[in-house]
A protein has these predicted regions:
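Charged phosphate-binding loop/patch that engages nucleotide di/tri-phosphates or the phosphate backbone
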Residues: 172-204
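Short, acidic/hydrophobic/Gly-rich beta-strand patch recurrent on exposed beta strands
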Residues: 44-47
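Short small-residue beta-strand/loop micro-motif enriched in glycine and branched aliphatics
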Residues: 52-56
């Protein structure tokens, strides 16, 4: 154990657990959990090629921000323009110095921000990418968003070769539709963050 400041850290254990991954072996995709709170519905897609229901998501463009990727991919795959939600998302992101409370000398930043309202991502799903022909570990970042499920989606927004059908389903039915447990968990996290931020879901 080595002492660094006030902390004792096992540098050998850190070294053993640390891994380097070249950029071409790291897959980053982004998507949204888009909810119509008035009608308690969530936007999903039916992937005709894979024959499964999924959340809308997709790969980043070069130098594109992750946040922009999530909104773009949602629109491309569904035709719906989602509006991102500012929520009390528990996050390890830090406040900039100018936004820190003036609590005097010795104030330590919290490890987790619990109640700060932001448009941070709500969670991730991670897995080895089975569709990649070379080694790739994929992480999908999700943001909470909203949209009117009765609005008319834009046409011809999907990329060539995509064959996806957008669907609005009742939030109560996500476990009947979504193929992956991790995506079910993401939807539940979005609902939880919305409720703890004061949003009413399914209440006229």
């Amino acid at each position: 154990m080595e002492r660094h400041g006030e902390e004792q850290l096992d540098m050998d254990q850190i070294d053993l657990s640390m891994r380097f991954n070249p950029a071409h072996e790291v897959g980053i995709s982004c998507g949204t959990v888009t909810i119509d709170p008035k009608r308690a519905k969530v936007l999903i897609i039916w992937n005709i090629r894979l024959q499964i229901h999924q959340l809308p998501k997709g790969r980043r463009n070069v130098e594109e921000s992750w946040f922009d990727t999530a909104l773009r991919e949602t629109h491309e795959e569904t035709g719906f323009a989602a509006t991102p939600l500012a929520l009390r998302v528990p996050t390890r992101a830090q406040l900039p110095k100018r936004a820190l409370p003036n609590k005097g000398k010795g104030y330590k930043k919290p490890e987790i921000l619990w109640d700060h309202v932001s448009r941070e991502f709500i969670g991730t799903c991670s897995y080895p990418d089975p569709q990649s022909k070379s080694p790739c570990f994929k992480t999908v970042y999700f943001w909470a968003a909203t949209c009117d499920s009765t609005s008319t989606p834009d046409k011809d927004t999907q990329d060539e070769g995509e064959n996806l059908i957008p669907k609005w389903i009742d939030l109560a039915d996500i476990e009947k539709f979504l193929r992956f447990e991790a995506e079910i968990a993401v939807v539940k996290k979005a609902v939880s963050d919305m409720k703890r931020s004061g949003h009413k879901i399914g209440e006229q």
